[in-house]
């Protein structure tokens, strides 16, 4: 277990040990965070029905769109705080923490109001099926009421991860996930609240996790990142850092999610069985996404602290190490999902028609996961060095624009579910090649002093 505890200075020592020490708790933390929606889907699919499952599944793209925006902005705070921590600039660190926490309140309030009132319009724009529309609208409206604690939690844990503390966020997520599971079962099985019950359970769990992380930051008495609510201000320098790094990252997330909205709209043009199968597949492929996300976030923190300390060659070495680690993880996940496709899909929805479609999706897509890992890892390293604009442009063109072109020009000619799914590996491969070219030949790894002068 000692191996999984990061040392106080990640600018020295074996790179793989530091990355693994970050990755393991972050992976489990991401697992429990994903467990919110997975448990919702499981409870609805098994105890309510496939129409309710399609309703909850139809909300996924919209939820990911909003989450992508504020997690993108949070990444700006994470990188700035990690660089200050690596360079031991404690006053800048303090200002960054208090600016980030105030921003989380403002962003959460905005999305709470906007999301609640725009939900019906957004679902209609997505072409949500009539039988799934009422449940999807109810779920989303309740979900958006919990935006403030959701954003506060993500920003607060971002602060902790930026300074290398990945264990406390894990503990908070475990507590929140247990709360979510218990409330899901109680509200659906005992009170028969169906879709509303799983949404209420999710919001209550988010409130608990937000309270835990804020209290933890306030009680970090000897730490330079201790949080004092009365010191929350919008300081100019942290705002600049957050916007320079966070806005392109947020836009990239928005474009990813927007392209997925079009994917969801295309999926909605098929049968309810197809929508339910796509939802079940989405809950399975989350195991890959939480793995690559955990490794990418670990690398961003590692890169940010080493960039702040001027350890540029060590930063580049960490990219090679993380790529080798992630390739091994990806091959193992892909093989397991391919071989166990039938029981995995049946776990979420045993309906025969849904099961057949779900198995086909799993075995078509999981072998292509390996084509995506460079996008996430190279972008994470470059972002840790304070650059996020060019990766955003590459991703928007390679993933989003090309994916939309596929949906508008290829899918209408060959209107099948697998043809829609094929948009993923095709765009991943092209974008991976483009981001590697920028990583190899672009001028992204400039010394901090030069970067500051340009700003």
Where are these regions (language model features)?
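N-terminal transmembrane alpha-helices
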Residues: 10-48, 61-76, 80, 105-112, ...
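Transmembrane helical elements of multi-pass membrane transporters/channels
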Residues: 21-40, 142, 153, 176, ...
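Short alpha-helical transmembrane segments in multi-pass integral membrane proteins
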Residues: 1-23, 81-146, 190-247, 303-368, ...
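Small-residue hotspots at the loop-to-helix junctions and early N-terminal turns
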Residues: 50-61, 140, 199, 272-287, ...
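Small-residue-rich hydrophobic transmembrane alpha-helices
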Residues: 53-113, 150-169, 277-341, 372-395
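Short runs within selected transmembrane alpha-helices of multi-pass transporters and secretion channels
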Residues: 74, 142-161, 169-177, 198-213, ...
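Hydrophobic transmembrane alpha-helices of multi-pass small-molecule transporters
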Residues: 65-68, 180-185, 210-214, 287-290, ...
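Helix-terminus/linker motif at the lipid-water interface of multi-pass membrane proteins
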Residues: 31, 35-54, 123-130, 186-195, ...
């Amino acid at each position: 277990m000692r191996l999984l505890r990061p040392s106080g200075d990640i600018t020295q020592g074996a790179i793989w040990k530091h990355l693994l020490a970050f990755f393991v708790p972050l992976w489990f933390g991401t697992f429990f965070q994903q467990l919110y929606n997975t448990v919702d889907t499981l409870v609805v699919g098994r105890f309510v029905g496939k129409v309710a499952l399609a309703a909850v599944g139809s909300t996924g793209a919209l939820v990911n769109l909003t989450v992508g925006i504020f997690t993108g902005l949070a990444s700006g705070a994470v990188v700035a705080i990690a660089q200050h921590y690596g360079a031991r600039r404690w006053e800048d660190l303090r200002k960054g923490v208090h600016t980030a926490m105030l921003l989380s309140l403002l962003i959460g309030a905005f999305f709470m109001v906007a999301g609640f009132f725009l939900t019906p319009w957004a679902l209609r724009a997505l072409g949500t099926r009539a039988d799934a529309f009422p449940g999807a609208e109810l779920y989303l409206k309740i979900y958006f009421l919990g935006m403030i604690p959701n954003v506060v939690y993500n920003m607060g844990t971002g602060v902790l991860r930026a300074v290398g503390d990945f264990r406390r966020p894990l503990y908070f997520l475990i507590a929140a996930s247990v709360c979510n599971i218990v409330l899901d079962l109680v509200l659906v099985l005992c009170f028969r609240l169906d879709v509303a019950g799983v949404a209420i359970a999710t919001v209550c769990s988010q409130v608990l996790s937000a309270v835990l992380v804020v209290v933890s930051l306030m009680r970090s008495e000897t730490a330079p990142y201790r949080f004092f609510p009365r010191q929350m201000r919008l300081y100019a320098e942290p705002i600049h850092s957050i916007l320079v790094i966070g806005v392109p990252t947020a836009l990239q997330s928005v474009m990813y999610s927007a392209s997925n909205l079009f994917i969801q709209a295309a999926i909605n043009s098929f049968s309810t069985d197809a929508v339910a199968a796509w939802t079940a597949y989405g809950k399975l492929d989350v195991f890959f996404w939480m793995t690559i996300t955990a490794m990418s976030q670990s690398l961003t923190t590692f890169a940010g602290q080493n960039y702040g300390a001027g350890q540029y060659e060590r930063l580049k070495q960490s990219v090679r190490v993380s790529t080798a680690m992630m390739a091994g993880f990806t091959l193992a996940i892909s093989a397991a999902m391919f071989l166990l496709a039938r029981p995995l899909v049946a776990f979420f929805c045993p309906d025969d028609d849904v099961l057949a479609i779900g198995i086909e999706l799993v075995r078509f897509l999981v072998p292509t996961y390996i084509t995506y890992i460079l996008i996430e890892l190279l972008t994470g390293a470059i972002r840790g060095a304070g650059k996020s604009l060019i990766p955003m442009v590459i991703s928007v063109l390679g993933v989003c624009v090309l994916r939309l072109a596929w949906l508008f020009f290829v899918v209408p000619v060959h209107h099948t579910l697998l043809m829609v799914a094929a948009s993923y590996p095709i765009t991943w491969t092209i974008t991976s090649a483009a981001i590697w070219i920028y990583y190899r030949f672009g001028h992204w790894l400039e010394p901090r002093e030069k970067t500051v002068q340009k700003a």
